[in-house]
């Protein structure tokens, strides 16, 4: 790492007021001293709490990532403090989420009414409160800052310079990538976000990418230094997402034993493309009308932001496509509010397949979780989904978002039990590649490397 890289202040050299050196003078003079162990990590997840229900508001895969990584780090003896913005007065300022994992709810702006697009106006207040929380602790309280999403990265960069510790950053999503793959009618990410992301990429000591594809995007689209980018795959809680008896799962969920269940699970937003699935189902039924009597399409999740239980536009589309049962044939589409991880695992196990038609995914956690239950995935051949799903082995990848192509892929799985069984076996095999324990070990290696390179820089 170059200590003189713009935006990176050398450690242990002329610290400003209130800063402390990561390495004391005596230690710097002793080449035998090894890098101190990582004892405590400050996780920053400004815009969404890891305690929120995934599938609601802005809560999704990132929430699962932050809390699961934190739990696994704590299991290795590393204390984790997660800083997030309070969105209700009902939560305590400090919550002991798990042994070794604390969630600190920071008051920054009103509890309700702020959209994610309005949160940059609260960065200053949020950052101030994070710095105050650290200032109340002994000097050197945190060894690493790990920020998630660009808003958190802005705060993390300030904490990095103030505390004299390395900043590790995970993008999770990137504006330039999203804008290159916009759904029809979706709103482009603003220039302010792009600028903010570029600043975070420049400020971070290490960048964690979910896949090789994301790593290349960081280098090619954001001019990230390749030597500062490490690929660490997210994991799956294999204790929760595991094979279950399908008949039992269906009985618990009120699904017919002989149903063809095409599950969509996630936030209902243009990027996730649930409309593509509905149009594909309509195409499938037009070509194979005899499927209607046993076809069930659960849409499990809620819209981004506050929203309704199911957005009117998607419900209207289901009606227009004749999938709502208004004609007396019974509803094909069922809207299901967001569910717990345990309940989601049951839905995945009950499904014939899980559909992930997103226009982009940095990883595609729900696809990995579905495979861990032994359920094949039909996914768009975009972003991290091409890493998670092995085409023809654990599921099918669809190169387009054309409903006809999607209908063909759905039909291949629904109508061929032997093929589906082969995919199910491959899904279980593929799922073994992803565990949160492995993610935590690799992430800890990134933390250690960031600390070691800061020592070299000073």
Swiss-Prot record:
Quaternary state and interactors: Homodimer.
Keywords per UniProt: Glycosyltransferase, Magnesium, Metal-binding, Transferase
GO terms, biological process: mycothiol biosynthetic process
InterPro entries: Glyco_trans_1, Glyco_trans_4-like_N, Glycosyltransferase_grp1, Mycothiol_biosynthesis_MshA
Enzyme class, UniProt record, top EC level: transferase
Keyword Glycoprotein in record: no
Function: Catalyzes the transfer of a N-acetyl-glucosamine moiety to 1D-myo-inositol 3-phosphate to produce 1D-myo-inositol 2-acetamido-2-deoxy-glucopyranoside 3-phosphate in the mycothiol biosynthesis pathway.
GO molecular function: acetylglucosaminyltransferase activity; D-inositol-3-phosphate glycosyltransferase activity; magnesium ion binding
Binding site for Mg(2+): 351, 375
Residues that hold 1D-myo-inositol 3-phosphate according to the record: 47, 58-63, 116, 149, 173, 193
EC number: 2.4.1.250
Reactions catalysed according to its record: 1D-myo-inositol 3-phosphate + UDP-N-acetyl-alpha-D-glucosamine = 1D-myo-inositol 2-acetamido-2-deoxy-alpha-D-glucopyranoside 3-phosphate + UDP + H(+)
SUPFAM superfamilies registered for this protein in UniProt: UDP-Glycosyltransferase/glycogen phosphorylase
Species assigned in the record: Nocardioides sp. (strain ATCC BAA-499 / JS614)
Family the entry assigns: Belongs to the glycosyltransferase group 1 family. MshA subfamily.
Protein name per UniProt: D-inositol 3-phosphate glycosyltransferase
Residue span of region Disordered: 1-29
Binding site for UDP-N-acetyl-alpha-D-glucosamine: 53-54, 61, 267, 272, 339, 361, 369
